[in-house]
């Protein structure tokens, strides 16, 4: 970095891209270190002192308003506010500076006319944080180092009134030597944290613009002989059968010291040991390790490397440990391979996010995410768009996830729209800051086997600065490949990336690339944009995996909604998004793109992901099931097949069978005791179930399923024996053995009683031709285009009924017309033909010159006591025509209140496809039953208009109805992106075609 003329902090540093690190110690690996072997075995180091917990803090709107005396004097400490570290200041004290969300635009856009590298002198929230700590004599006799794991966005460090140093970069560690300034007894640490600095121009990620000490703060005590940095590599030879352990040790105080290195397996057995005299700062030790098991996400085999340092007297000064995974990642014949096998990423992008604490991660949350990802067959994570906390990589090593580790660089707002001050581009004044961010990530994370690619950042255009970063990665670590998507936008330096990476590229365009004899394999670094009710058409992407070897998967955008849990004015909990805190400019709910909600509730999108990412395929047949193990390395062992056999919606038999071992890439047919399949519609469903707890997954976890449907439902013949109609002046009534129906001559069915004679309908049904707009609808304009269907649904006049009587049946025919379309009518027919049921038929004649239809159906407003839903169709979770690969046919139940998925912005949700029968009843089983062929059904408390008008689920209060929507079809939901991509034609329904469907209503 640039030579600093003055070594005491000046506010001008905040706007100087060449000043980003002052008096920091060099970057190093994140290995663990201990004073003794006993400490190492207990994983409790006396050489690390946590400073997490209660701190005192002072807020100022900008640096000029922050008193310097707070840095040097303890006089006011007791008057300051207490905060808990780690924290985001916007979550800990929102009255200081409320949360603010923007996507690509910089948060100061429109407030101040700033250009890179300028920083506001008016708005730059500055928080001075104070922590007192005590040190013992043995501690101060060692080198005392302050370790800041993550501070956003810039930090100035003072200890005991002395200025120590300054650092930028919110997501990699900063270390400062405190040795000259600390003493025995009480010491005072002051951190002044700035929300904005030149680094903020490179931290324009699509996330909440927090500031804070969001990772742990600790003191490290380095003994006289200290392993400062450890590098481990594991090259494989002889067709990946021989492994070598290569280590590089950088040791402080190495003179006349020794290092003893030991490699042990999971059981503690020693596989290798060596001793190395240390005479220089840098030493190398290598050895071939026979018989090791290789690391992969399928089989995350880890070994423990222990390095014991001794001084000239032979005394142990330090014990260091790191996990080692033997694996080799490389490009072979233009295909990325792990341990010689073509790899396919079934990945997600994952922001570090907690709805209660912002970017503060806890062990429990990390474990939950990894467990849920593994249960969804996710095998890879892109750390969008910054290095994660170190523990995340350790857990990925242990439980098996591949990682693209991404540098904390995004400058989207500087080039969209394009400016003449795009950063970093080819600007020499930004080059060192770019390299420093990549170097800090690589040096900390280099020993984690889970990391397969280094990423130069995200959406930062292109240019020489990023190219030089990619070259640095290659020089320092030839064992991994380099990723950067920005080359797709700016191809001046195509060699910045080793893989061709795109965002939101359509399937047809991807195929064009793959058919062009490309030089690089293809991955989607972001695809199937999961904003709200989305991920439609995802199966078209995963279908490319078997078709094109150079298609190597992708990473869903993204894992978790970035929604903050707050109390709404009505007292309900709310998951808040941009604009909810008065934060402007904002991009509203555009950061709620997760397959799970902000509180980590899973959605129907997870059902689809779990199925499409499965690596074990189950194909039932008349005698059993064929199981295909598509894993690359792992023999399928320790699983059961749970199966069910149904005929005409009735259970016939079920069981659970031990699955024999199946080698990678092999198949086996498992005979199951079905007997002769009965006539009718026979459904065989098989589930792959984990027999015992394995890794992070609990026993009973279902990882895959397969289903086959044989034959067709036997139709019961029902004689026409309808009760005689009671034809009045205004209404027509029917009273049968299990039927009580009243139809208005104008308006349709107005009364439908259950078998106890209680009313089920609140009002006559309405046409259902539109839906509450999804986020994708709003993005592609479908919310506007569907206006004509809202008009027909809600503003049509219903004609007087045409009553048609035949022997044993009566039909009332209604025509729905609107003045805006004088020559057009939708016809609805109610036919009573038995003592306990009536048929409803909807005829759509076709309407030319109109957009695709969102839906075709009828909406019934039922008595709110009817809340229990039991459905035979595809489930168990919501599904749509373009997102139902992961659903299976069967009986599924839910409560009407849960029929609406609580997306941050209420929208169309809760649909079930392929429905044959659905009942909506009270607790005693009385209510309404609907049956038909291949219906689509939703049951929830809210009308589309109510969902459309609500900004949050908490706005929907006091439901007075249960809404049963019965449709012939619903348009797909789409998901290629959420800002213009249409629903694909094969999942749409042209309005100019005629459609007819019928269903039966029955009282229960």
Label the model's feature ranges.
Residues 95-119, 168-170, 178, 182-242, ...:
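An acidic-aromatic loop/edge-strand motif
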Residues 157-159, 242-277, 625-629, 633-656, ...:
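Beta-strand-rich binding/interaction modules
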Residues 91, 97-102, 195, 296, ...:
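Beta-strand/loop-rich accessory regions of lumenal/periplasmic or secreted enzymes
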Residues 183-186, 250-330, 682-718:
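Extended acidic/polar, glycine-enriched regions
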Residues 205-227, 571-620, 630-638, 643-650, ...:
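Catalytic cores of secreted or luminal carbohydrate-active enzymes
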Residues 1-107, 192, 542, 549, ...:
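Accessory carbohydrate-binding/adhesion or oligomerization-edge regions at the termini
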Residues 2-41, 201, 316-626, 630-651:
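Extended substrate-binding grooves/exosites of carbohydrate-active enzymes
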Residues 2-24, 33, 38-42, 56-60, ...:
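Accessory beta-strand-rich segments of carbohydrate-active enzymes
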């Amino acid at each position: 970095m640039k030579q600093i003329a003055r070594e005491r902090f000046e506010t001008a540093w905040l706007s100087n891209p060449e000043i980003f690190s002052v008096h920091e110690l060099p970057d190093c690996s994140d290995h663990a270190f201990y004073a003794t072997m006993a400490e190492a075995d207990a994983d409790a180091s006396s050489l690390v002192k946590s400073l997490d917990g209660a701190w005192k803090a002072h807020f100022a709107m900008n640096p000029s308003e922050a008193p310097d005396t707070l840095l040097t004097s303890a006089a006011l400490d007791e008057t300051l506010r207490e905060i808990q570290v780690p924290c985001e200041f916007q979550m800990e004290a929102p009255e200081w500076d409320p949360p603010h969300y923007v996507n690509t635009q910089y948060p100061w856009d429109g407030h101040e006319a700033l250009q890179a590298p300028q920083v506001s002198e008016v708005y730059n929230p500055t928080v001075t944080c104070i922590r007192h700590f005590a040190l013992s004599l043995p501690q101060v006799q060692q080198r005392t180092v302050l370790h800041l794991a993550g501070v956003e966005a810039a930090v100035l460090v003072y200890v005991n009134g002395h200025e120590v140093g300054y650092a930028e970069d919110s997501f990699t560690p900063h270390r400062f030597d405190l040795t000259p300034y600390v003493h025995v007894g009480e010491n005072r640490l002051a951190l002044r944290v700035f929300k904005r600095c030149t680094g903020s121009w490179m931290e324009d990620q699509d996330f909440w613009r927090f500031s804070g000490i969001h990772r742990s703060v600790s003191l490290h005590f380095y003994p006289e002989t200290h392993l400062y940095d450890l590098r481990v590599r594991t090259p494989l030879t002889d067709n990946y059968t021989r492994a070598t352990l290569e280590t590089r040790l950088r040791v402080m105080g190495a003179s006349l010291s020794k290092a003893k290195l030991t490699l042990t397996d999971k059981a503690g057995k020693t596989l290798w040991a060596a001793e190395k005299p240390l005479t220089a700062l840098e030493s190398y030790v290598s050895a071939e390790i026979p018989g090791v098991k290789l690391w992969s996400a399928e089989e995350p085999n880890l070994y423990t490397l222990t390095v014991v340092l001794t001084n000239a007297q032979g005394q142990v000064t330090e014990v260091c440990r790191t996990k080692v995974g033997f694996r080799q990642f490389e490009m072979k014949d233009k295909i990325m391979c792990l341990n010689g096998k073509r790899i396919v990423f079934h990945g997600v992008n994952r922001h570090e996010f907690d709805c209660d604490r912002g970017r503060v991660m806890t062990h429990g949350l990390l474990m939950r995410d990894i467990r849920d990802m593994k249960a969804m067959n996710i095998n890879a994570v892109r750390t969008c768009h910054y290095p994660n906390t170190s523990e995340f990589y350790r857990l990925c090593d242990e439980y098996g996830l591949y990682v693209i580790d991404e540098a904390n660089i995004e400058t989207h707002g500087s080039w969209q729209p394009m400016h003449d001050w795009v950063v970093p581009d080819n600007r020499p004044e930004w080059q060192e800051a770019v390299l420093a961010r990549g170097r800090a990530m690589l040096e900390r994370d280099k020993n984690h086997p889970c990391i397969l690619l280094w990423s130069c950042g995200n959406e930062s255009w292109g240019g020489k600065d990023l190219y030089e970063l990619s070259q640095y990665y290659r020089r320092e670590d030839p064992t991994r490949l380099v990723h950067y998507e920005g080359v797709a936008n700016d191809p001046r330096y195509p060699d910045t990336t080793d893989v061709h990476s795109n965002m939101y590229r359509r399937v047809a365009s991807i195929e064009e690339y793959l058919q062009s004899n490309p030089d690089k394999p293809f991955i989607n670094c972001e695809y199937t944009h999961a904003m709200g009710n989305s991920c439609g058409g995802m199966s078209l992407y995963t279908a490319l995996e078997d078709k094109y070897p150079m298609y190597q998967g992708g990473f869903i955008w993204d894992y978790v909604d970035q929604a903050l849990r707050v109390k709404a004015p009505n007292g309900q909990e709310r998951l808040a998004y941009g604009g909810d805190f008065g934060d402007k400019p904002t991009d509203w709910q555009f950061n709620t793109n997760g397959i799970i909600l902000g509180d980590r509730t899973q959605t129907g999108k997870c059902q689809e992901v779990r199925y499409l990412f499965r690596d074990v395929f189950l194909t039932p047949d008349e005698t059993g099931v064929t199981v295909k193990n598509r894993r690359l390395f792992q023999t399928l062992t320790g699983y059961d097949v749970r199966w069910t056999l149904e005929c005409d919606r009735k259970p016939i038999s079920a069981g659970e069978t031990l699955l024999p071992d199946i080698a990678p890439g092999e198949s086996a047919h498992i005979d199951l005791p079905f007997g002769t399949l009965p006539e009718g519609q026979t459904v065989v469903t098989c589930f792959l179930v984990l027999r015992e707890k394995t890794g992070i997954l609990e026993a009973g976890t279902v990882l895959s399923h397969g289903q086959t449907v044989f034959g067709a439902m036997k139709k019961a013949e029902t004689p026409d024996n309808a009760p005689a109609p009671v034809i009045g002046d205004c209404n027509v009534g029917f009273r049968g053995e299990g039927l009580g129906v009243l139809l208005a001559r104008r308006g349709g069915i107005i009364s439908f009683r259950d078998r106890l004679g209680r009313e089920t309908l609140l009002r006559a049904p309405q046409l259902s031709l539109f839906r509450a707009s999804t986020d994708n609808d709003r993005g592609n304009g479908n919310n506007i285009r569907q206006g004509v269907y809202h008009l027909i649904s809600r503003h049509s006049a219903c004609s007087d009924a045409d009553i048609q009587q035949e022997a044993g049946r009566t039909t009332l025919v209604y025509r729905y017309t609107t003045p805006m379309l004088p020559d057009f009518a939708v016809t609805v027919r109610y036919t009573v033909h038995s003592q306990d049921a009536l048929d409803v038929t909807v005829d759509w004649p076709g309407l030319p010159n109109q957009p695709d239809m969102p839906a075709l159906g009828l909406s019934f407003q039922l008595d709110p006591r009817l809340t229990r839903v039991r459905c035979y169709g595809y489930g168990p979770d919501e599904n749509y025509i373009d997102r139902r690969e992961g659903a299976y046919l069967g009986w599924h139940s839910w409560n009407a209140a849960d029929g609406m998925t609580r997306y941050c912005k209420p929208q169309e949700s809760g649909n079930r496809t392929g429905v044959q029968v659905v009942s909506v009843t009270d607790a005693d089983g009385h209510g309404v039953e609907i049956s038909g062929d291949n219906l689509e059904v939703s049951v929830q408390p809210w009308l589309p208009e109510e969902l459309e008008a609500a900004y949050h689920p908490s706005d929907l209060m006091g439901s007075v109805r249960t809404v049963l929507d019965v449709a012939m079809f619903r348009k797909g939901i789409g998901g290629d992106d959420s800002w213009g991509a249409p629903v694909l034609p094969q999942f749409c329904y042209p309005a100019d075609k005629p459609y007819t469907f019928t269903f039966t209503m029955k009282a229960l």
